[in-house]
Amino acid sequence: MRRYAILGATGNTGQALLNVLLQSPDNQIHAYCRSASKLNRLRPEISQHRQVKVWEGSLEDVSLLSECIRGTRAVFMVVAIPDNMPHCTIAQDCTNAVLNTLKKLQAEGCQSLPKLIVLSSASLEDSLCADVPPLIHRVLNIAAGNLYSDLAKAEKILRAEKHWVSTTFVKPGGLVHDVQRGHTLSTKTAKTPVSFLDVAAGMVEIADMDDKTYDMMNVSVNAIGDGTAFPWKGVYYVLTGLLFHFFPWTYKYFGDSPMPKPRKDL
């Protein structure tokens, strides 16, 4: 029986991971979220599901987070927001919380630490986006620049800990809600679009590998064949992302989440 922890279980990728992992009756899932009531609204069956245990809390609660992560094979770090929030530090906050938790587990005598499977973006790697026209790539980087900056800083933190933490950075192209069509893993190119379900399946495949094939590597998940729906919602987020980039104060009125205050320590 394999145990996995999902950090960000109420998000799009977190929900997709639940779907993929529950395809096997042998998987045990530790779902961590800020709001158990939201998770129950999204998945009413979860509260009584024998394969799922839910932890409700903040990332700052290292004791609770350690209980969620303890004994798992892999931790899926998919805490995210969909829009270009100014001063975003959610990826860095999650990374620091997980590292503090792993240090706690080590201090308590834990002999085997889980892999970290981190959801990132292909836009951080020019090599994965070689097929994207330069102008479009530039626009996308501006429209999600705050998120990408946060992801890049979080990745730098994790790479500095490579001597004791095993991490894989999953960097897909544009994500969309669609059926699971099958996927391939690639370290050379990222194709858009790809469904959340296919990305989740790719993340699980990486987690289940017994070797360190993708340790500290950038890996994209690509859909097999054609037919994946066009990410029309992504167009909306590009437009609002440009708005938030040039006029950050507008996020207070049109953003998806409460706007954080700038932090001087990051």
Swiss-Prot record:
This is Oxidoreductase aflX. Coiled coil: none annotated. Pathway: Mycotoxin biosynthesis; aflatoxin biosynthesis. GO terms for molecular function: monooxygenase activity; oxidoreductase activity. Its EC number is 1.-.-.-. It comes from Aspergillus parasiticus (strain ATCC 56775 / NRRL 5862 / SRRC 143 / SU-1). One of its GO terms (biological process) is aflatoxin biosynthetic process. Keywords: Monooxygenase, Oxidoreductase. It comes from the Eukaryota. Oxidoreductase; part of the gene cluster that mediates the biosynthesis of aflatoxins, a group of polyketide-derived furanocoumarins, and part of the most toxic and carcinogenic compounds among the known mycotoxins. The four major aflatoxins produced by A.parasiticus are aflatoxin B1 (AFB1), aflatoxin B2 (AFB2), aflatoxin G1 (AFG1) and aflatoxin G2 (AFG2). The gene is aflX. PANTHER family: FLAVIN REDUCTASE-RELATED (PTHR15020), UPF0659 PROTEIN YMR090W (PTHR15020:SF50). Belongs to the avfA family. It is an enzyme of class 1 (oxidoreductase).
